[in-house]
Amino acid sequence: MSVTYDDSVGVEVSSDSFWEVGNYKRTVKRIDDGHRLCSDLMNCLHERARIEKAYAQQLTEWARRWRQLVEKGPQYGTVEKAWMAFMSEAERVSELHLEVKASLMNDDFEKIKNWQKEAFHKQMMGGFKETKEAEDGFRKAQKPWAKKLKEVEAAKKAHHAACKEEKLAISREANSKADPSLNPEQLKKLQDKIEKCKQDVLKTKEKYEKSLKELDQGTPQYMENMEQVFEQCQQFEEKRLRFFREVLLEVQKHLDLSNVAGYKAIYHDLEQSIRAADAVEDLRWFRANHGPGMAMNWPQFEEWSADLNRTLSRREKKKATDGVTLTGINQTGDQSLPSKPSSTLNVPSNPAQSAQSQSSYNPFEDEDDTGSTVSEKDDTKAKNVSSYEKTQSYPTDWSDDESNNPFSSTDANGDSNPFDDDATSGTEVRVRALYDYEGQEHDELSFKAGDELTKMEDEDEQGWCKGRLDNGQVGLYPANYVEAIQ
């Protein structure tokens, strides 16, 4: 494809050779491309840093959530510790990925930004100084040769036109000989025309050859000047290429966690924690604490004593150890004792029978004293288990299906979370957010630094508070993300 040189030399370019007029522009464009490539590399690293940060946050949230679930779940002993080791691994790996993010942005990103600023200098009229210098250098080196090339093209065009005219004159003269109507005078004019065309052909040929010779004589100097400017552009590009290689190697070191001593230690510790799990030890512990190894106050003969105001029958003692936990006690007066969740958990051998006995019989009721009654409050919705229903059944096979997963997000984070402790209401306090927080679960609040909300409950043992936004949304948020409004 032919293009026209924009320096008004009127030369048509028939190839993409560097030596053709105007084809140096690809070399000039490479300078502008270098600046754009610096920006592209910075954007590339910035996106990777965002990914590293998001992954670190997800690991932290995952570890927090599952640490809470495992702590309150039915798993026990050394296997529980091995399971919990994965949460510690996630937290430590999260820290490493945050370090990767910091290295990418603070070291690599800033290094590219500073180099770009030092290597490329913007002009008031737009563009870069380096681009204009290269453009002017090539234009100056090519201008004399392009001028001679223009003369050659003009001489060639004139010579070819003369040759064409000569051929036409000869053709007319040959045709006129066969025409008897032409007089000798007309025939002589045609012959004179042929002679004149031959002279024009000779003159244009000499001029064409002369201009071409002059062009050939100026070509070595043209090539030398163009080569000099091109080498300057090559040196500039070499600096950029070497810099990119250096930066990419540093990025590789920052991303390669296998070379971090702490990374190997994380998985060494994880493996040791898993290998420390001992099924025999866990079974022995469960036998001693929840099985036949437990101590028992076997029934013995007791002498009757008039000083005893209250006695418990064997049946009552059995019920007391069957795991019935009272959540409310109504006394004879208007006074009532607050409910207190049990700190221990006893699994009844027959839950249905125990529940029936609990509702129909009070083990602390004095058989002789009709003035005092002890009963459960029917309207109390407090749970008698502090964390997890130990008697619930689990599916035989583990499944990713949320409907069969006892630790699914619906159960673990929704309103029916079996691990949630009873909420205890407190005095509402207005607080202000210190940092931005984006809720990771549907029961968590999202807010920006400076937003105000209402704290409804004090911080729990996991570091979370219950609060309400001004739009009425109620949920959980990290306690250390806010401060009380003075």
Curated annotation (Swiss-Prot):
Example GO molecular function: phospholipid binding
Disordered: annotated span: 314-426
Residue positions, PTM Phosphoserine: S273, S313, S399, S446
Modified residues (N6-acetyllysine): K53
Tissue occurrence: Widely expressed.
One Pfam family named in its UniProt record: FCH
Start and end residues of each SH3 domain: 426-486
GO CC terms, sorted: adherens junction; caveola; centriolar satellite; cilium; cytoplasm; cytosol; early endosome; endosome
Principal subcellular localisation of the protein: cytoplasm
Compartments in which it is found: Cytoplasm; Cytoplasm, Cytoskeleton; Cytoplasmic vesicle membrane; Cell projection, Ruffle membrane
Biased composition (Low complexity): 348-363
Entry-linked InterPro entries: AH/BAR_dom_sf, F_BAR, FCH_dom, PACSIN1/PACSIN2_SH3, PACSIN2_F-BAR, SH3-like_dom_sf, SH3_domain
Family the entry assigns: Belongs to the PACSIN family.
Subunit structure, as described in the record: Homodimer. May form heterooligomers with other PACSINs. Interacts (via NPF motifs) with EHD1 (via EH domain). Interacts (via NPF motifs) with EHD2 (via EH domain); this interaction probably stabilizes the caveolae. Interacts with EHD3. Interacts (via the SH3 domain) with MICALL1. Interacts with RAC1. Interacts (via SH3 domain) with DNM1, SYN1, SYNJ1 and WASL. Interacts (via F-BAR domain) with CAV1. Interacts with TRPV4. Forms a complex with EHD4 and MICALL1; the complex controls CDH5 trafficking and coordinates angiogenesis. (Microbial infection) Interacts with ubiquitinated HIV-1 gag (via p6-gag domain); this interaction allows PACSIN2 recruitment to viral assembly sites and its subsequent incorporation into virions.
Name of the protein this chain belongs to: Protein kinase C and casein kinase substrate in neurons protein 2
Annotated organism of origin: Homo sapiens
